[in-house]
UniProtKB/Swiss-Prot annotation:
Residues 1-16 form the signal peptide. Its main location: secreted. It comes from Rattus norvegicus (Rat). One of its GO terms (biological process) is response to estradiol. This is Vitamin D-binding protein. PROSITE patterns: ALBUMIN_1, ALBUMIN_2. It is found in: Secreted. Disulfide bonds join C29-C75, C74-C83, C96-C112, C111-C122, C145-C190, C189-C198, C220-C266, C265-C273, C286-C300, C299-C311, C335-C376, C375-C384, C407-C453, C452-C462.
Length: 476
């Protein structure tokens, strides 16, 4: 599928399929004609699976069936000029029925209170939160071929749904490219005289594309959750924690560069955006940090740019530096033209001194700095800072201490050892707890730690979990 085809269909489906405007209809009809029904349907399945990842296969399949059917009917030669508008209106009405077979969304009921085009636009804007914990598990070669031989089309549909709903934050061209290559591999190897050898060879050839797709899904998911400014802060925190001996001038350009890449590539319909941009970023990583840190130097000996990127991405935090405590930025720092520079400097200095996961630091720093910046809009900013700074400092300190307590021992131990130490700490803290109560607390705390105490923890899930744990501190 050529880049322009993906571009046009993505735009048409993402923003306009339900609108019924002539120019949008023409785009979709052009794609149906160019791609053919089967590829058009496959691309529709990918798009709706990534848009509604919490839905069932049956719900997404039913929606795709309706969309393909109305597109075929309304794009046929001699079709009624009002066909597209009529059929999309019927689809939006059907979506509002209590037993509608389509993806379920909490916003549907509100959309159904609207009429006509307004309802269609409301429906078109609905989407689920992306999956932050991909659960797709590839079957064995034998299981793949058994399912493929039994029902090739059914296997392909199920795979497109499962993979696209789990890795839907990867740029669309990467998702299309990988899934198409995967299904081609299955078709070739399951009809081969030596399927095991075939799968081994094909997977080796697809390895870099697979890594690029899954890693792009990771970083784009984080970017989608944070937005551009918080992503920039997040990358700065991570780099400062990984290389606390570096200078701000070494790490800030890297944080900004990666943020700019994600802003360009995550929603790009260019086939090679990530493949072109990430290798250039790894050169900058090695140029800035390989001489500052032995682990980054080791990463830069990896044989491929993707290897370097993955090595640096998954690198754990280093021991924080033992440096004098730093003061919060003042009104002079935050209310002048150099406010961004002051916030970057404070974020960097706090991060290199602090051993608490990035999701904690990003959350509390965002709240702290935002509250102080609001003082700049008051009549007496100096007085506001004098009042707010001590409060923010106490909240910041309490938050970090609580985060360190929640994640204590996690990064330095295997999961089994961590759970043992956690049980010992909880037993000491609550000596009267029954074995069942203790087991429940260990399970709850260890589940939280496994998801939110690493350097690349998913922001959406962990933010809500941290809110629940830190409510008293955040509301103080």
């Amino acid at each position: 599928m050529k880049r322009v085809l993906v571009l046009l269909l993505a735009l048409a489906f993402g923003h306009a399929l339900e609108r019924g405007r002539d120019y949008e209809k023409d785009k979709v009809c052009q794609e149906l004609s160019t791609l053919g029904k089967d590829d058009f349907r496959s691309l529709s399945l990918i798009l709706y699976s990534r848009k509604f990842p919490s839905s069932t296969f049956e719900q997404v399949s039913q929606l795709v069936k309706e969309v393909v059917s109305l597109t075929e009917e309304c794009c046929a030669e001699g079709a009624d000029p009002n066909c597209y508008d009529t059929r999309t209106s019927e689809l939006s009405i059907k979506s509002c029925e209590s037993d509608a077979p389509f993806p379920v969304h909490p916003g549907t009921s509100e959309c159904c209170t609207k009429e006509g085009l307004e309802r269609k636009l409301c429906m078109a804007a609905l989407s689920h939160q992306p999956q932050e914990f991909p659960a797709y598990v590839e079957p064995t070669n034998d299981e793949i071929c058994e399912a493929f031989r039994k029902d090739p089309k059914g296997f392909a549909d199920q795979f497109l749904f499962e993979y696209s709903s789990n890795y839907g934050q990867a740029p669309l061209p990467l998702l299309v490219g990988y899934t198409k290559s995967y299904l081609s591999m299955v078709g070739s190897c399951c009809t081969s005289a030596k399927p095991t050898v075939c799968f081994l060879k094909e997977r080796l050839q697809m390895k870099q594309l697979l890594l690029l797709t899954t890693m792009s899904n990771r970083v784009c998911s984080q970017y989608a959750a944070y937005g551009k400014e918080k992503s920039r802060m997040s990358h700065l925190i991570k780099l400062a924690q990984k290389v606390p001996t570096a200078n701000l001038e070494d790490v800030l350009p890297l944080a900004e560069d990666l943020t700019e890449i994600l802003s360009r590539c995550c929603k790009s319909t260019s086939e090679d955006c990530m493949a072109r941009e990430l290798p250039e970023h790894t050169l900058k990583i090695c140029g800035n940090l390989s001489k500052k840190n032995s682990k980054f130097e080791e990463c830069c000996y990896e044989t491929t740019p993707m290897g370097i990127f993955m090595c640096s991405y998954f690198m754990p935090t280093a021991e924080p530096l033992q440096l004098p405590a730093i003061k919060l930025p003042t009104s002079k720092d935050l209310c002048g033209q150099s406010a961004t520079q002051a916030m970057d400097q404070y974020t960097f200095e706090l991060s290199r001194r602090t051993q608490v996961p990035e999701v904690f630091l990003s959350k509390v720093l965002d709240t702290t700095l935002k509250t102080l910046r609001e003082c700049c809009d008051t009549q007496d900013s100096v007085s506001c800072f004098s009042t707010q700074s001590p409060l923010m400092k106490r909240q910041l300190t309490s938050f970090i201490e609580k985060g360190q307590e929640m994640c204590a021992d996690y990064s330095e131990n295997t999961f089994t050892e961590y759970k043992k130490k956690l049980a010992e700490r909880l037993r000491t803290k609550m000596p009267n707890a029954s074995p069942e109560e203790l087991a429940d607390m260990v399970a709850k705390h260890s589940d939280f730690a496994s998801k939110c105490c690493s350097i690349n923890s998913p922001p959406r899930y962990c933010s809500s979990q941290i809110d629940a744990e830190m409510r008293d501190i955040l509301q103080s």
